[in-house]
Amino acid sequence: MDTLDIHEILKHLPHRYPFLLIDRVIECIPGKSLVAIKNVSYNEPYFQGHFPGLPIMPGVLILESLAQATGILAFKTTETMPSEEAIYYFAGIDRARFKRPVGPGDQMRLEVELVRSLRRLWKFTGRVTVDGSLVASAEVMCSYQETYK
C-alpha cells in the first residue's frame, strides 16, 4: 500500500495550479484502489464567482478531482508516468450523482476503485465524502492516449 505526498503527485499528474485537485494520496493499492484527499480552501479561484456570498465548489470540479485520482491509480498500476508523448485523458462519466455541496474548510476524501481495463480504456467507480457524509459518486472512464499538440 502506497502513500503519495504532493511532490509525488506532481510526478504522476500533468495538472498544475489552479487545476491540480489532489493534495495527498493516503492509500494506493495498484490494480485495485486509491484514496486521496483534497483540502478545499476559501482561496480557491472558483469561489470568486461560484457563488459570491455562498461559495460552493462546482460539481464538475468534484468530478475532475475523481478523474485525477483515477489517473494516479492508472499510472501506479502500469508503473508509468505522464510524458510529453502520452497521458490519461478523462474519457467519460456515467451515473454521476451529487448529494450535498462542498465549501471552504471541507476536506474531500476521494475513493476510486478499478472496475476493468481493456487496452487503453480504464473504468472506475468513485465516491467523494466529507466528514463521512457522501458528497458525490460516479463511474469514471479514462483513456491512455498520445498527447495532442
Swiss-Prot record:
The active site is at H50. Transmembrane segments: none annotated. The keyword Cytoplasm applies. Its EC number is 4.2.1.59. GO terms for cellular component: cytoplasm; membrane. It is found in: Cytoplasm. It catalyses: a (3R)-hydroxyacyl-[ACP] = a (2E)-enoyl-[ACP] + H2O. PANTHER family: 3-HYDROXYACYL-[ACYL-CARRIER-PROTEIN] DEHYDRATASE. Belongs to the thioester dehydratase family. FabZ subfamily. This is 3-hydroxyacyl-[acyl-carrier-protein] dehydratase FabZ. It comes from Nitrosococcus oceani (strain ATCC 19707 / BCRC 17464 / JCM 30415 / NCIMB 11848 / C-107). The gene is fabZ.
